Each structure stands twice: as C-alpha cells, then as structure tokens.
Amino acid sequence: MSETILMTEGLSKRFGSRWAVKDLNLDVRAGEIFGFLGPNGAGKSTTIRMILTLLLPTSGNVKIFGKEVRGHRVEILSRVCGIVEKPDFYLFLSAHKNLELLGSLSRKVTRDEIYEALEIVGLKARAGDKVKTFSHGMKQRLGIAQAILTRPDLVILDEPTSGLDPQGMKEVRELVLKLSREHGATIFLSSHLLTEVEAVAQRMAVLNHGELIAQGAVSELLSDGSSYFTISATPMDKALAILRRVSWVEVVAEGNGIDVRIDSRRAAELNRLLVTSGIDISAFAAKRTLEDYFLKITEGASEV
C-alpha cells in the first residue's frame, strides 16, 4: 500500500447548531488522484479550507506527510498548494506577473519556473497578456499553473471545471492526468461533476450533508449493487413485454436498445430468460456509471 499523504481524523466543523462537516475520516495516498465528491453544499469546500488551515475545525485533526498540520503549519504547507473555489488574480497584470507575485508568497520563483508552469497548462504564449483578457477556462488553467508553480507534493483543486464548457472541461481533465503521470503529484480533486472524477480518479470519497458515506477504489465502488444495462434484442416489442413482467427488472428507457436497472448479480439470469423466451440478444452491456452509484448511495443516506 502506498504511503498516506493526507489523513483527516474525526474532522468536524459546526456553524451555530449546524454541522457543515461531521466526523470525517479521509485517507489520500501518494501519487494518486483522489476524487472528493458531493453535491453543492455537502461540505467539500469547508473541508478543504480546514485542510489548508483557512478555517479552524470544531474538532478533529488533519495530518499531511505524517504530521499534524496544527503543529507544523509552515513546514507542511510549503509542500502543498490549493485552489479553493475559483482562483483570483490581478486582472490588470499579466499572467507572468501574477505568477511571480503569487509564487513569491511561498518563496522566490524563477523566470524559468514561471514559464514552465505556463507551458504545462498551455498558456506560455499568453504569458505577457493581461489576465482581464483571459476567458474563464484560461483563468482556471492559470489557477492550476499557480498551484504547481512551486512544485508541491500535494495539489488540492476545488471544483476546477466549474463553469467551463465541454472543451474546457476536457482540457482541465487532461491537465490533471498530466500532472499525475508526468510530474508525480498527488492530487486531491473536489467536484460534483461525477463523470469527470470517474475519468481521472483511482480512489474517491463521497460526502453528503457533511458526512462521509463512501470511500474506496472507484472500480470497487462501481461494482457494488445494482447496475444499468443496455439490451439490444429482436423482436424488441416482445423483449420489452417480457422485461416489464419481471418483478426485479426496472425498465428505465427504450429506444435503439432497452435500458434496464437490475442487481448486477442477476445479469446472466436475465440474459438466459430472454434467450429461452425466443428473444435474439445481440448486445447485453453494462452501463454502470459513477453517477448511478452516487445517486443510489445519497438517496439511501437521506432515507436513514
């Protein structure tokens, strides 16, 4: 098992009578992309602010690189960079000057380091342009350049694709993968965009109403419980009629194929049932997604 880079132990934050985060235990390992998922208002940004010591917890501890942040703040945070919510810049200054000023808050950064960070995020050609001329997506990428400027061992990104169009989201996703694969950074990625996390993260935690409701490998969490399958069958109308009569099958959509929700352990049984009923099956494919899993467990948690 890889070394634990970031750990929270019973981390909690209360505002008045409301618990924004309650008894949170996270385990982020070296070199991985860790997805931190939850709907808006789940407590993700509050958690990140506590990790970065921007907000004092009501109770609990944060350990980074094996040490409690409270007693080693300067030492630890010199190896960490986080962008909370949207990055802010001096709009009337150039991208280069912004990174020079913001980087100097940690240490003096060189011209080469600034250009290298801008090159990684695809903004080297715009280094001299004022940030006020940048699109939202370019500002998000500049924020990531700021995060990696001092070569941190841990990068914390809070909703980095927020407000981006599909192309911008794709660029940020590819950038996150590049930081992990080519630069060896451990990345803590907060998002409510579940398909984005599914595409890049090895492990994840799911937060709902301030409480941890799941944590583990994405592949393992996705394989648990009911799944969605798309069935291509002939004759389609007869197959649909059979499926609607089976009590443990939920037909959720029909079109070129039939989308059903079943217990994944009964997929082979359903396939046999259709074949023995005279249905020609040309495709029976799983459609399980992280969103299905997320909706399932958050619905379950809200019913408790």
What residue ranges belong to the model's regions?
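Alpha-helix N-cap/helix-start and coil->helix boundary motif
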Residues: 12, 96, 120, 194, ...
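Alpha-helix boundary recognition
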Residues: 65, 78, 198, 222-223, ...
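Residues that scaffold the ATP/ADP-binding catalytic core of kinase and kinase-like folds
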Residues: 72, 221, 293, 297
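Short, charged/small-residue-rich alpha-helical element at the C-terminal edge
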Residues: 227-300, 304
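ABC transporter nucleotide-binding domains
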Residues: 3-8, 13-189, 194-208, 212-214
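ABC transporter nucleotide-binding domain
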Residues: 173-261
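Short, Lys/Arg-enriched, disordered terminal segments
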Residues: 1-3, 303-304
